[in-house]
């Protein structure tokens, strides 16, 4: 597993600190946003994808509550899941299927606390080779990464549109998203089931396009990108710090919603990408803290019905997702935040 550690005082562009409030956003009148009397150190898993770009600001916002965040960079959500389940991390954001996959393997130490948004995952074809409807998928060679949220959305869309996934020309792509682009350019595949910034790279380089069809609007999964989750041991021992983390997260998402272009620049800097690529990736993403429990249950059922997990955990997932911290941080009801949606 390839990880890179960053210090708790992550440096950001000067413009960010100039715009950031110097005190917690809701002021001292809200008990959930008061500064902790003693500092609490936290390890946060971070994957460098555009949908998670607001989380680059989490250390800076959490520091206002006396929570000291150290970010650890991961290349794959699966590795973040393993680290959070084991307690090597206290907080992480990964695919909405990851807590379910953990439960299927007997890991009960991860608790989902907030949503991240929608979009981000994408389909990509060579320019001029559009796929206008799902019937047009059948003859194509399709590059996928089994287990990824983009793959899950695609597999659900295939079923909902009357195709037999088992009869498709599936090509398993190993490694990172760059390998999908190489395979697509090299005509080893005709469609990549991938995610940003890799779609954005193909688009801005001029050789690729999005097909007319999309896999981000299925009844089973919807457009969910990721879930923010806590390690249960950390959550139980440090509930007040956990609340401050979620409150800080809500604050940074509000900043991202207000100024997506600013976050495109942050993402470009952190990922070492051209700003045009980052801007295209962010354009495809909608930041949102709500978390649809119905979608999570639908994902669990889909994974079981299709043999990805050996045990049906759809009836258990609710107890591994809590709206307590998010409701306090936003002042909204759990039902409004997705518990009944």
Predicted regions and their residues:
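Short, glycine-/small- and polar/acidic-enriched structural segments
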Residues: 28-177, 183-186, 190-196, 212-213, ...
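Secondary-structure end/capping motifs
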Residues: 236-312
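Pocket-lining segment of extracytoplasmic ligand-binding domains
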Residues: 97, 173-267
